[in-house]
Amino acid sequence: MFNLEQLHIAIIGLGYVGLPLAVEFGKKVPVIGFDIHQKRIDELNNGQDHTLEVSKAEIQQAVKLRYTSTLEDLKDCNFFIVTVPTPIDDFKQPDLTPLIKASTSIGQVLKKGDIVVYESTVYPGATEEVCIPVLEKVSGLNFNQDFFAGYSPERINPGDKLHRVTNILKITSGSTPEVADYVDEVYNLIIEAGTHKAPSIKVAEAAKVIENTQRDVNIALINELALIFNKLNIDTEDVLKAAGTKWNFLPFRPGLVGGHCIGVDPYYLTHKAQSIGLHPEIILAARRLNDRMGEYVATQLIKEMVKQRIQVVGARILVMGLSFKENCPDIRNTKIVDFIKALKEYDLDLDIYDPWVDENEVQHEYGLAPIKKLENGLYDAIVIAVAHNQFKTMSAQEFQALGKEKYVLYDLKYILDKTESDLRL
């Protein structure tokens, strides 16, 4: 029934997750990469990737891959992989709109014998409770009779050149035992690290959502410890280094938890828990604490400026870094923006410098205009917010030179020695 020789893959969504997947599969089997944005299709046809996840050489190696924004081009595909975003709304509830729209599109070209695999992070049950009914309604086909489904959660780490799609172990699952075997077989075409076949779609969904929830809770604990140690006038990094000498102490650091995964996924799990009458305590407490860190960091900076007799109103602040993590242009759900918003309440001037981000995207998403280059002697405070390689290679003297005669240097990322900055998280 399912034959690798007849495999024709469609990747729905060509962002940070979909493109690397499409490129790897495109080296082996016929693949069509579909994206609703024609600008993205044109960019990829020119061998360019603004996310910087895939190089031009890698794109050129995918000789069996072509790109389209035309749904009709997918009618000959028989294995659909959905990699669209799953954000939250303003009320921190799951926004499944992209997933529903993708399912609606696939339903229009779905045929008997086709398989639809979802990679987008969701709560346990979402694939079968939300996506499958859409596919059935639009296609007129019956689930597990005419078409089938699978779930294989993405584990892409944007900006990470060491952990790539092929060398990260992949969880797979299917709606029947036979489909699960076939989905696993398909992914093993490209996943060198191997696969783990989960016993059900719900198990695979749950596994993904707790991966990031666990990280979020652990970082929240360290953030809370940082708040305590700051009050006690103890350097947090010194404490973590000392505690880290024990073999089973987990190596987490305090910070602003943003991005499309860690700061979002826990809300998918808590939404599902609340829908069945459970109220998660630890997960939501961790989220609240991590969401407040931007405001806390801003307050700490203002306090230090006041302590050093630096005029706050009208002060000029430099924020170095805007992306949600180092060496990556991704600005989705970056918590640096929360920090910036909190600072703006003090009626001061802000410059943002980040050599990785796209200026137009920043302007469109947040209404901010990053500066293009650094100038010395301009700032009342300098904040190292993201540990880009460009910043890590700068000396303490280079950071200090950016300040006026009197200034505050706040190192959020432990780039400098503790003696070389005024504040650390």
Predicted regions and their residues:
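Structural/interface elements that position substrates and couple domains in central-metabolism enzymes
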Residues: 1-425
